[in-house]
Design a protein with these regions (language model features):
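Localized sequence-composition bias
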Residues: 1-139
C-alpha cells in the first residue's frame, strides 16, 4: 500500500555536540494528498535503547496547517545535557485522530562529546549518569 505521508529525511544539526550545547532536528516529509492536522513525535534513545526524552506536538497543542508536497518540521533543543556517547532519534507522524501514519526508529544518530562543564579540569562521562543536571553546591 502506498503511504500518503512519508518521511524523506531526518537531519540532526550538528552531528556532534559537546554536553550542554544546542541541537536542532529537521524532519523533512512528503504529503501526497493535501491534508491538515499532522502531529509529529520525536524520541531520543541511548545505545541501550533507553528512551531519554520524547516530545509529541499533539500533547503541546501543535499540529500542521493544510500541507501538500515536501514540508519540514523542526524541533530545537536549546541545551542537550547528555553525557558522552551516541544517541539515536526516532520520529513519527500521526494524523489528527492520533493514528500512526509513519514511525521510523533510529533514523538518525548524533554524538555527544565530553566536556568540562564545571571548569574543574574533569571531563564528565557516563559514570556521571545519562544526563548532566545543572546544579550548585554550597559548603
Amino acid at each position: 500500500m502506498d503511504r500518503e505521508v512519508e518521511v524523506t529525511q531526518v537531519t540532526s544539526v550538528p552531528k556532534a555536540i559537546f554536553t550542554g550545547e544546542p541541537l536542532t532536528v529537521d524532519i523533512e516529509y512528503l504529503v501526497k494528498s493535501q491534508c491538515s492536522g499532522l502531529r509529529f513525535g520525536i524520541s531520543i534513545e541511548n545505545q541501550l535503547g533507553q528512551r531519554i526524552s520524547a516530545s509529541y506536538t499533539g500533547r503541546e497543542g501543535i499540529e500542521s496547517d493544510d500541507v501538500i508536497g515536501i514540508n519540514k518540521a523542526v524541533i530545537h533543543f536549546p541545551v542537550i545535557n547528555l553525557t558522552p556517547g551516541e544517541y539515536y532519534i526516532t520520529v513519527a507522524i500521526h494524523d489528527r485522530s492520533n493514528e500512526n501514519l509513519v514511525r521510523i526508529e533510529r533514523i538518525e544518530v548524533f554524538e555527544v562529546i565530553a566536556k568540562d562543564v564545571a571548569d574543574s579540569g574533569y571531563l564528565i562521562d557516563q559514570s556521571s549518569g545519562i544526563i548532566w543536571l545543572d546544579h550548585k553546591w554550597t559548603l
